[in-house]
């Protein structure tokens, strides 16, 4: 991340204020303040991750994925024979924290800050699927979008989607 000295000074002062305003995270803010003040290039790359960007299209796709899982669970709940499909298969797992951190961060933002999909179970890992999921979700979305009644899925349609 490239910053002028003036930008670094402003950010350093912000971290100094955050240290006073948020004592529970003071050590983290002091560390970031030191990195900014001294211009440690390698560590400043951490800020690139924190100040990253998700394009609108990506955000909409993630919401679409979450909506698909909502539809899967609602449809599963309405099945006469729920035993044929394990409920865990229609439960949203999230994204991989190691390789899909920005997607995972957006999911957490949507649930914890925006208050959407609060009925989703974050599990003990907070929507960290611990395996890359993006490509799997894309295949699932393609099948789901082809279904004529996306919120009234049959057991066969649910199986086609989750096995995509």
UniProtKB/Swiss-Prot annotation:
Gene3D superfamilies: Helix hairpin bin, yfbu gene product, domain 2
InterPro entries named in the record: UPF0304_YfbU, YfbU_alpha-helical_sf, YfbU_helix-hairpin_sf
Disulfide bridges in this chain: none
The organism's place on the tree of life at top rank: Bacteria
Record-linked Pfam families: YfbU (PF03887)
Family: Belongs to the UPF0304 family.
Record's protein name: UPF0304 protein YfbU
Encoding gene, per UniProt annotation: yfbU
